[in-house]
Amino acid sequence: MLTAENIQLNCYETVYILKSDLNEDKTLSIINDYKSMLTNGGAKNIVLQHRGRRHLSYTINDYHDGIYVQVNYEGNGQLVKSFEKSLRFDDNIIRYLTNKQKRNIKKDS
């Protein structure tokens, strides 16, 4: 039986790219909204890195530049599924990718 004491949390890394024509206030608002979404969903040890504007290797939706954001966190598969669904339907996100890291953390409390 699964209880809160023995739930396995997996480590994930999500990188998403925002449209380059967003102003700084809108960019920070989107980043903070997604961070709070992870926190409310039960993610632990959230590390957010705002990588800034970078040139894309190839054009995506007529954009040559994008604003990169990297988020590392611990959570379960359901959290990742809902997080990716939100990213998929956000018009300000032009691309995202989530990778599961090898290390597992056992939740103690």
Curated annotation (Swiss-Prot):
Transmembrane segments: none annotated. The keyword Ribonucleoprotein applies. It holds the Pfam family Ribosomal_S6. One of its GO terms (biological process) is translation. GO terms for cellular component: chloroplast; ribonucleoprotein complex; ribosome. Keywords: Chloroplast, Plastid, Ribonucleoprotein, Ribosomal protein, RNA-binding, rRNA-binding. GO terms for molecular function: small ribosomal subunit rRNA binding; structural constituent of ribosome. It is found in: Plastid, Chloroplast. InterPro entries: Ribosomal_bS6 (IPR000529), Ribosomal_bS6_CS (IPR020815), Ribosomal_bS6_sf (IPR035980), Ribosomal_S6_plastid/chlpt (IPR020814), Transl_elong_EF1B/ribsomal_bS6 (IPR014717). It comes from the Eukaryota. Belongs to the bacterial ribosomal protein bS6 family. Binds together with bS18 to 16S ribosomal RNA. NCBIfam families: S6. PANTHER family: MITOCHONDRIAL 28S RIBOSOMAL PROTEIN S6, SMALL RIBOSOMAL SUBUNIT PROTEIN BS6M. This is Small ribosomal subunit protein bS6c. It comes from Pyropia yezoensis (Susabi-nori). The gene is rps6.
